[in-house]
């Protein structure tokens, strides 16, 4: 029979939470206190995974023990990860991946630039898909992807007059950096872009299509989608812009990428070339400084130069600047849509649509 002490121990034993429980301030202080370097990297793989929730929980325990921070999506169709890890644990992390046949010999794309502050927490989620594409995967062969090209091959193919270079990223990514003469669909999401591509490339089915994205994952699905719709010569940049930057540096190749590479972490961008090709959304001055609007009810991502940052206090509009100076409780009321005062600042006004910021642009633009 168990004694009272044993019963008390069982009563007070709590299951360890398999998610972050700390706020941004605490997480930031922890990261600042680290006295070792971190390595930022990304990887993905389309592979059938079983018992996804159980796998997610095991990965969380194992990767948290290695000090991994980042954003990882797992789904029945595979894994998509952007993360940072203490550099001294990198080999252990590779061993962890190789211990599972589904993740063995994973191509890890190391960040071009790294300030060791790319992520604050470990965020590992189960999703229906590792990239939101809005497609019915049963309707076409998702494994029939385009031909993978090295940086050298991609450069050479760009010289072919029959080639069409297509950026498979969102407009806010391509705005600060893209390949020479690339077609830049003005889409807000990958789901939108896939539909736009068919319209944009209509009648070009016999051309050589050269696709690229940040790390390669979006090209996997987009290339299969185009091949399903009759495109005969579909190619994609192996490892995306990240691998391209490393290869041209290692081999001394000419870079045909202009500007910076947008990344989905705290860094927001990596320098590929020194050229600034984008402009401040507010004054039109040359700038590639991406920030989120300082108004918590907006938080829209946009480009703002230093002068406009000071003028608008980090906000995207005068309206957001006005909201920023309201009492905190009033701001909360506005965000919840409960305030009857200052009706101009409704949620739709606080969070302007991208299409409004870009209302003077055409649906499709070429670099």
Swiss-Prot record:
GO MF terms, alphabetically ordered: oxidoreductase activity, acting on paired donors, with incorporation or reduction of molecular oxygen
Gene3D superfamilies named in the record: 3.30.70.100, Rhodanese-like domain
Disulfide bond sites: none
Rhodanese domain segment(s): 159-249
Domain of life of the source: Bacteria
Residues annotated as the enzyme's active site: 213 (cysteine persulfide intermediate)
Keywords assigned: Oxidoreductase, tRNA processing
Class of this enzyme: oxidoreductase
UniProt keyword annotation of Oxidoreductase present: yes
Record bears the keyword Oxidoreductase: yes
BP GO annotations: tRNA modification
Pfam families per record: Rhodanese (PF00581), Rhodanese_C (PF12368), UPF0176_N (PF17773)
Family: Belongs to the TrhO family.
Summary of the function given for this chain in its UniProt record: Catalyzes oxygen-dependent 5-hydroxyuridine (ho5U) modification at position 34 in tRNAs.
Protein's name in the database: tRNA uridine(34) hydroxylase
Annotated source species: Leptospira borgpetersenii serovar Hardjo-bovis (strain JB197)
Chain's gene name: trhO
């Amino acid at each position: 029979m168990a004694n009272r002490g044993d019963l008390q121990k069982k009563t007070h034993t709590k299951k360890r939470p398999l998610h972050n429980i700390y706020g941004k301030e605490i997480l930031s202080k922890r990261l600042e206190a680290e006295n070792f370097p971190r390595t930022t990297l990304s990887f993905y793989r389309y592979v059938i995974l079983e018992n996804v929730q159980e796998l997610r929980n095991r990965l969380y325990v194992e990767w948290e023990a290695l000090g991994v921070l980042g954003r990882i999506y797992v789904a029945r169709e595979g894994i998509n990860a952007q993360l940072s890890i203490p550099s001294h644990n990198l080999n252990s992390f590779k061993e962890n991946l190789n211990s599972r046949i589904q993740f063995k010999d994973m191509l890890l794309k190391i960040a071009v630039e790294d300030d060791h502050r790319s992520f604050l927490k470990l965020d590992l989620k189960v999703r229906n898909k590792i990239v939101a594409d809005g497609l019915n995967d049963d309707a076409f062969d998702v494994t029939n992807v385009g031909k993978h090209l090295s940086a050298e091959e991609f450069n050479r193919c760009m010289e072919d007059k029959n080639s069409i270079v297509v950026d498979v990223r969102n407009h806010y990514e391509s705005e600060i950096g893209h390949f020479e003469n690339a077609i830049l669909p003005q889409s807000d999401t990958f789901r939108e872009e896939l539909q736009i591509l068919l319209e944009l490339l209509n009648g070009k089915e016999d051309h050589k299509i050269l696709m690229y994205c940040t790390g390669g994952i979006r090209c996997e699905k987009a290339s299969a989608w185009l091949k399903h719709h009759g495109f005969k010569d579909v190619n994609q940049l192996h490892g995306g812009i990240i691998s391209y930057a490393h290869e041209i540096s290692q081999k001394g190749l000419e870079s045909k990428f202009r500007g910076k590479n947008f990344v989905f972490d705290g860094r927001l961008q990596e320098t590929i070339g020194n050229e600034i090709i984008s402009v401040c959304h507010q004054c039109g001055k040359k700038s590639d400084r991406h920030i989120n609007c300082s108004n918590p009810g907006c938080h829209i991502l946009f480009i703002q130069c230093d002068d406009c940052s000071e003028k608008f206090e980090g906000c995207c509009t005068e309206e957001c600047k006005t909201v920023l100076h309201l009492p905190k409780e009033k701001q909360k009321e506005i965000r919840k849509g409960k305030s009857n005062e200052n009706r101009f600042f409704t949620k739709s006004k606080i969070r302007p649509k991208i299409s409004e910021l870009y209302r003077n642009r055409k649906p499709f633009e070429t670099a």
